[in-house]
Amino acid sequence: MHEASYALTIVDTVMEALKKEGLENVKVTKVIIKIGELSLVDPVALRNAFEAYSLGSPLEGAELEIEVVPSKFVCKRCGHEWTFKDVYPELKANIPVIHLYPHLVKDLLKCPKCNSSEVEIVQGTEFVIEGFEYQESNE
């Protein structure tokens, strides 16, 4: 379950940012992240892990806003573009592997138009903390 490692990274990164900016008496109310579709992150599991890892910190009780970035592939040979959803039936058996190693999806894909294996992942592997919102703490 790599959702736990994502959650820990989110908490650690925001805590570092708070310390760096001298924001010691604040309560984080929202954390905004973008996660690529190819990571196959379960938003419920991620939120649960975030909730657990943020206990006792300024992030406790913060909303975790998750934007899932859709995948996009392009064939280097013919230029055709497509998404993960377009080829999901062919990749269904490999979902557990893709879940753990999203970068391997490139090795499992062929262009649906020309059948070339020269495929580039344009988007869908992101993990970005876009920002966070906070308010002054009463404590």
UniProtKB/Swiss-Prot annotation:
Involved in the maturation of [NiFe] hydrogenases. Required for nickel insertion into the metal center of the hydrogenase. This is Hydrogenase maturation factor HypA. Pfam families: HypA. The keyword Plastid does not apply. The lineage of its organism: Archaea, Thermoproteota, Thermoprotei, Desulfurococcales, Desulfurococcaceae. Ni(2+) binds at residue 2. The gene is hypA. Belongs to the HypA/HybF family. GO terms for biological process: protein maturation; protein modification process. One of its GO terms (molecular function) is nickel cation binding. PANTHER family: HYDROGENASE MATURATION FACTOR HYPA. It comes from Ignicoccus hospitalis (strain KIN4/I / DSM 18386 / JCM 14125). Zn(2+) binds at residues 75, 78, 111, 114. Keywords: Metal-binding, Nickel, Zinc. InterPro entries: Hydgase_Ni_incorp_HypA/HybF_CS (IPR020538), HypA/HybF (IPR000688). It comes from the Archaea.
